[in-house]
Amino acid sequence: MNKKWKMMVLMGLAATGMMVSAVSAEESYKIGICQLTQHEALEEATKGFQDYVSEKLGDQVTFDVQNASGELSNCVTVINAFVSEDVNMILANSTPVLQAAASATDSIPVLGTSVTDYPAALDLEKWNGVTGTNVSGTSDCAPLQQQAKMIMELIPDAKEIGILYCSAEPNSRYQTDMIRSSLDELGCTAKVKDYTFTGTDDIASVTTTAAENCDVIYIPTDNTAASNAELINNICEPAEVPVICGEKGVCEGCGIATLTIDYYELGQITGEMAVDILENGADVSQMAVRQAEQVKKCYVPERCEKLGISIPDDYEEL
């Protein structure tokens, strides 16, 4: 073998070695995902997140997806396992999961999604849109004043408005306070009363009481209500009481109308934040909590027709 040929072979081997070295040095990431329970909105947010991150990072990323089955103790167990594994990031899908993650670690980046009120969830006294901690994410809060307008627009003669929600969910308590305030600001003269349940054991009895006393029921974005939407519908529909909801998944199960965000889009936005942190070194403590960019009015035609409720032209069918 002549010297020139030997040199070419050596150069080729060196180049190959450099390529192997570059590939082996490519960063890999593990993201732990904990979803509170199984229902459409949360699943769409998880899917949107995974799709976006997978599209951008490909084989560099793996996901450990866990469902807490609606149990707060399971949230803690799952999150603690992620921390022990030293995952690169945690996606906390819902408020209780976010709270568990924020308590478990101050070093692993935590992104929340399907979380309505970050200051309340994290017990932050001052709020300027960033947490200043290892936590950020996306909020699923649709404009609550517009939801209040929807109640008044669709059921203008209501004498009593019932707000049905789980008292154990901070998101729901926040939305209830905001809806009350918005109804008052809009000059609503109806009596507004809370009907709170503590979990699945008393949701039927509380819903029955609400249906017996109210002209319309409002359900905010509430995980327990979402998981029991069919039960709520089986009580409210025979009682001919319309239900207006804070998100699409609940509305499909028991409502007549909703002003909703796109949870898949919300997950995609959260995924964009994740890639920025993992690949670009963005500081999670300085990342502003983001929201879905679009909301839309939707209605369920079959239920509206049964109740004789006229729907304006700017609503879309569910």
Specify the residue positions occupied by each region the protein language model found.
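Short, low-complexity disordered leader/linker segments with a strong preference
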Residues: 1-30, 55
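Hydrophobic alpha-helical segments within soluble ligand-binding/sensing domains
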Residues: 118-160, 261-282
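Pocket-lining segment of extracytoplasmic ligand-binding domains
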Residues: 171-241, 247
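Short beta-strand elements in bilobed, periplasmic/extracellular small-molecule ligand-binding domains
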Residues: 50, 55-75, 134, 180-200
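An alpha-beta-alpha
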Residues: 31-33, 49, 136-186, 283, ...
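Flexible loop/turn connectors
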Residues: 250-302
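Extracytoplasmic "Venus flytrap"
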Residues: 30-50, 56-58, 64-74, 168-172, ...
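Beta-alpha junction/loop-to-helix N-cap segments that form part of ligand/metal-binding clefts
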Residues: 65-125, 222-246
